Amino acid sequence: DKVNGQQVLEMSGDDAMEFFRDQGYALQLAQQQQVLRLFRTEFDVWYSERHLHDSGAVERGFAALDAAGHTYDSDGAKWLRTSEFGDDKDRVLVKSDGEMTYFASDSAYYVDKRARGFDVNIYLLGADHHGYVGRLKAIAACAGDDPDFNIEVLIGQLVKIYRSGEEVRLSKRAGDIVTLEDLVDEGGVDAARYSLIRYPADSPLTLDLDLLVKRTNDNPVFYVQYAHARISSVLRHAADLGIDGQSAPFDASLLGEERERDLIGVIADLPRVVGSAAELREPHRV
């Protein structure tokens, strides 16, 4: 239901805080979804952490871990025995004051996803969360799964951005940031997608904003787009001549250049490369 300004003014402090929290959550989620649509990235499911708590999934997750004998109480807090499965220490699920930790949600979310039929759970973490890998795998082990199969963790590295030959200094605290939307606005969605996917996720990445908009072969995005345009032109010319690439006879003797044979080999290998890229979560291979 819509709430007018007067109703907001008449709310108690707690009600007003909850109202603005809900409004802020809805606004930020809508912005994130809009930017991802702009970036041509689609998620089949958007799962809220709030739903995890409201649906009882956290309690069900705790119950499953309790039943497996992997939780215990100490100093008024609830712990998970992650150190028995490779983590450097046990982790707190519920603090002594009753507040749940982030790790509690992570644990419950894993148990909930497995209950919903997801066999492999892929986590994409920032470079500063490398220490989280062990505890995520320990969650899988505590749930009776194989951490090496049921958990995949991809570690993303930092992105440096250059403009006019100088690094753009970023600071979240000062509000000096370059968003994904800014990147798309500067160079276009194709340039942004290609630039971010060109290297492995675990490699540091440098983006030159000036280079992204150059229409020269120095710009790898332009080079790929130019190659695509030339190939499309060849196919249109062949169609104008009545040549059907699917059924026309193939005369291999016309391919006398070594580069031509190499190119055919690369094209023939493309299905294997695409399959390997998907299996290894490494789209830069394509």
Segments (PLM) and residue ranges:
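Non-catalytic interaction-recognition regions
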Residues: D1-V286
